[in-house]
């Protein structure tokens, strides 16, 4: 639709005309708010982000062939036992049913008895995840994120060989992750092996878009800074919207909680990445290029 295209182009041109200093300030304010949210969550709960059963330990009760709303099951268990549980549906080649997650410290036997009352024809299957295993998973996840950042930073510095643009790319990726974690706290999404993987995916996507922008601006020839920025912005906007569309479809049509969580975290991160790449990084690069060319 030509009208929609024109509106989008006009909105993108507003970014091109924005003061570079303001482009830096606004994303930093959002980053600061995200840090405050994470710290507040730590003060209230003792954890920067709520951890799933895989990390904190607990029990997983599986009921094959059950086709009841997870919310109804969780509500009924709460009424019968006073225990808060997480319930999700699953389906696959091996069959379908529900999984009930019980935190370590809660009486799993009470939950099992409540489930037997609700579904007398189904035998609950229980798997216990010990705190030691959860600690190992947590440590491995943290190491994976740290190593990914170190590897990404090395590659970026080797590619550009210029401190300011390289550090901005690294900071943008870090900010994407921090904002995604803050939104996980707001929407109650737990940190698990799946969401750790989603956070790692964000690093790769962030680097792609930032390298596109930085390369276009630093290595432009016949274009002005504004023209190069607008050209890369249109490309980046197309990349982001198509990816967000795919993730939104995944979130809407998925029936598995783990898929919903992955899609949600990626959506949070991609929205943050659009801001950090095309506003924050662009503002830093425009100031850097203006200063560098002013000295030449």
Swiss-Prot record:
This is Protein-export membrane protein SecF. Part of the protein translocation apparatus. Forms a complex with SecD. GO terms for biological process: intracellular protein transmembrane transport; protein targeting. Involved in protein export. InterPro entries: SecD/SecF_arch_bac, SecD_SecF_C, SecF_arc. GO terms for cellular component: plasma membrane. It comes from Pyrococcus furiosus (strain ATCC 43587 / DSM 3638 / JCM 8422 / Vc1). Keywords: Cell membrane, Membrane, Protein transport, Translocation, Transmembrane, Transmembrane helix, Transport. Gene3D superfamilies: Multidrug efflux transporter AcrB transmembrane domain (1.20.1640.10). It is found in: Cell membrane. It comes from the Archaea. Belongs to the SecD/SecF family. SecF subfamily. The chain crosses the membrane at residues 23-43, 144-164, 169-189, 194-214, 236-256, 265-285. It is a multi-pass membrane protein.
